[in-house]
């Protein structure tokens, strides 16, 4: 079925094309249906043309239909249990609010009505800001504005859901992305492990809680998974030896554009772009027609993605510079090393002869080092980092030794094993070691490069780097989404390859009546044939259990969990309690962290934060802002999300307008999550009739 092999690639091409076209529209404030929809239709035409150029994989019809059903079921499951994370606490809230603002204001940047906030003098007061988590303040004085944290591709895609059906459409968009991502992963798996085992691998991926969690809330991971898997699938096709050179060049260019285009969704995808450079070098060394187009597409898309980040997300780049600088260094080192390798005509014979063993042992040792780190290493960051205070609070609440500087990076192999199981992890390791050895043999003997070259090198290396340094607050299940774009797909593909190999061996195992070389004696052929299918079936059932069983068991406790239910209604209540001419002055820490963009972007009420000191609202700063708001002819409304006391201390009469009891995901540091935690969402308003005391 061509649909299975081409739908994911077409969807990924549409995502990347739409993201490319949207950047100037978003920057110029033109992202509105009347302009965007024609552009998106052009992107559809491009995607259809691109998808038709991708060769299909032969296979039984039942396998293709099963794969589609698995992908649809995964998307429906995520959609039926979707979160309503709007009141901002984590990245999902940032994406949701950015997308809502983009859909309604037609640009990512948030304009700030400086006079309505008390004027430039009030904003210059110590402790007064328009910034909040996920939204940076840019400029000063009358030119102050707010910039969302992340790259524009995900908000652009989510904004389409808003245009379709408001909050419901926006919150369901990631589930649609997840279904397409599973289809793209399945298409990649069909090329690597065959149509039948592709169904098992895709089902296992859909069952893992981190993947389900990413599809339930407004995260970028489903779209990154979609484009990344499609890029890998096209690249496998581009290294096929059954196509003519012109087709291989076309597929190589497409693979490069898609691979580089992932960085339009997630900036850390620059890591995978860098890791493709050695692949390009190997292809070039074998004079593959794919090499140059692949490099051209990769370079073009990566440069465009980085330029986009500089244009619309510059503050975010500064915030993650500690992660980006090593990536930039890796690009330079890998590019330089690849160029040097291409110029070396003769490698030392001792190295060439032992290359298969060297690569296999290096793979095994790399895993051993990563997996053993909890025995001999505790990874820490600066205790002054804002994340360290969060970790310290979680440690205290969970009865752990308080050490806020811990990142728990050394535990990442364990995180992965939580969701796929130790057997699948060991199967993946065995497959990775075997593939490393086979690659060494191909390089040593000058044989043709295998089609799995690029996914194996990039997938294994990126998995190792992600596990080495995940770069995320280590509470679960939130931190586990770092495993979604590359780690879990790579592990499950390798495990599926190992199971397929073992199943094939079981199905063709020599009987007691085989000849010494393992072939069946002629007069025993019928008897051998009657036995071998049983071994294959048993091995297949066991393999399927090893792939999907642990994932299903780990996810089962949270399979039907819906978090943040009621937040859409809570936001509506907050907006209804405010009126035209109001200016929201947020005076406690929780209000300052969770509500500024909700009130500013969703309710349309100018909002300013007055940071408290030691838990006490800054009275002098509040007085300055209130006076400036009044001078502008507006009504200042003090806002608290922690308690009414913060408003009463300032002389305002507090009225609770939001009183929601809901749930959120657990925030565990050392255990696999298996449930939800209670969450209170409150909001008090205090209109100021006279100056605060």
Which residue stretches match the model-derived regions?
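Transmembrane alpha-helical segments
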Residues: 70-78, 269, 308, 468-469, ...
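Short acidic/glycine- and proline-prone juxtamembrane loop motifs at membrane-interface regions
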Residues: 210-223, 268
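Transmembrane-helix motifs of polytopic, lipid-linked glycan transferases
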Residues: 45-53, 169-192, 230
């Amino acid at each position: 079925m061509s649909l299975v092999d081409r739908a994911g690639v077409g969807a990924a091409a549409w995502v990347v094309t739409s993201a490319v076209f949207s950047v100037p529209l978003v920057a110029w404030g033109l992202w509105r249906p009347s302009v965007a929809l024609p552009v998106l239709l052009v992107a559809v035409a491009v995607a259809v043309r691109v998808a038709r150029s991708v060769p299909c994989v032969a296979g039984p019809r039942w396998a293709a239909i099963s794969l589609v059903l698995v992908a649809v079921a995964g998307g429906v499951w995520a959609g039926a249990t979707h979160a309503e994370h709007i009141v901002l606490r984590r990245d999902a809230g940032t994406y949701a609010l950015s997308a809502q603002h983009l859909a309604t204001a037609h640009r990512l940047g948030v304009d700030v009505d400086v006079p309505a906030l008390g004027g430039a003098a009030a904003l210059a007061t110590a402790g007064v800001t328009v910034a909040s988590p996920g939204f940076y303040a840019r400029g000063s004085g009358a030119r102050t504005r707010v910039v969302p944290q992340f790259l524009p591709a995900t908000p652009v895609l989510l904004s389409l859901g808003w245009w379709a059906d408001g909050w419901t459409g926006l919150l369901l968009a990631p589930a649609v992305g997840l279904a397409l991502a599973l289809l793209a992963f399945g298409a990649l798996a069909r090329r690597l492990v065959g149509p039948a085992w592709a169904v098992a691998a895709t089902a296992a991926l859909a069952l893992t809680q981190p993947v389900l969690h990413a599809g339930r809330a407004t995260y970028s991971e489903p779209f990154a998974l979609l484009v990344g898997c499609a890029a890998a699938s096209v690249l496998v096709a581009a290294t096929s030896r059954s196509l003519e050179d012109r087709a291989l060049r076309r597929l190589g260019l497409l693979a490069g554009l898609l691979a580089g285009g992932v960085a339009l969704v997630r900036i850390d995808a620059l890591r995978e772009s860098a890791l493709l450079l050695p692949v390009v070098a190997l292809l070039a060394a074998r004079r593959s027609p794919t090499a140059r187009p692949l490099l051209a597409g990769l370079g073009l898309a990566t440069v465009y993605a980085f330029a986009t980040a500089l244009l619309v997300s510059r503050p975010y780049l500064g915030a993650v510079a500690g992660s980006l600088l090593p990536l930039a260094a890796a690009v330079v080192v890998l590019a330089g090393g690849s160029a040097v390798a291409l110029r070396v005509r003769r490698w030392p014979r001792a190295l060439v002869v032992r290359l298969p063993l060297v690569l296999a042992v290096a793979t095994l040792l790399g895993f051993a080092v990563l997996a053993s780190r909890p025995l001999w290493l505790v990874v820490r960051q600066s205790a002054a980092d804002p994340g360290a205070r969060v970790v310290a609070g979680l440690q205290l609440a969970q009865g752990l030794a308080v050490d806020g500087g811990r990142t728990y990076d050394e535990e990442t192999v364990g995180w992965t094993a939580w969701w796929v199981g130790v057997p699948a992890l060991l199967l993946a390791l065995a497959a990775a070691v075997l593939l490393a050895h086979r690659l060494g043999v191909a390089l040593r003997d000058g044989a043709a490069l295998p089609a799995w070259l690029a996914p194996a090198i990039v997938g294994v290396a990126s998995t190792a780097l992600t596990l080495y340094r995940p770069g995320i607050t280590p509470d679960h299940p939130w931190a586990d989404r770092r495993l979604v774009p590359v780690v879990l797909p790579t592990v499950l593909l390798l495990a599926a390859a190992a199971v397929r190999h073992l199943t094939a061996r079981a199905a063709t195992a020599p009987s007691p009546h085989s000849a010494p070389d393992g072939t069946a004696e002629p007069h025993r052929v019928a008897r051998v044939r009657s036995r071998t299918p049983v071994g294959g079936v048993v091995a297949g059932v066991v393999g399927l259990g090893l792939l999907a069983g642990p994932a299903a068991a780990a996810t089962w406790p949270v399979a039907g969990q819906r978090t943040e239910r009621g937040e859409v209604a809570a936001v509506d209540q907050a907006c209804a309690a405010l009126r035209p001419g109001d200016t929201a002055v947020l005076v406690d820490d929780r209000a300052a962290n969770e509500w500024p963009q909700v009130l500013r972007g969703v309710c349309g009420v100018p909002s300013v934060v007055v940071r408290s000191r030691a838990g006490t609202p800054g009275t002098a700063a509040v007085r300055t802002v209130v006076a400036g708001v009044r001078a502008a002819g507006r009504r200042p409304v003090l806002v608290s999300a922690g308690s009414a006391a913060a408003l009463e201390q300032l002389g305002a009469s507090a009225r609770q307008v939001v009183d929601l009891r809901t749930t959120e995901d657990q925030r565990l540091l050392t255990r696999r999550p298996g449930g939800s935690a209670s969450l209170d969402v409150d909001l008090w308003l205090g209109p100021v009739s006279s100056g605060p005391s």
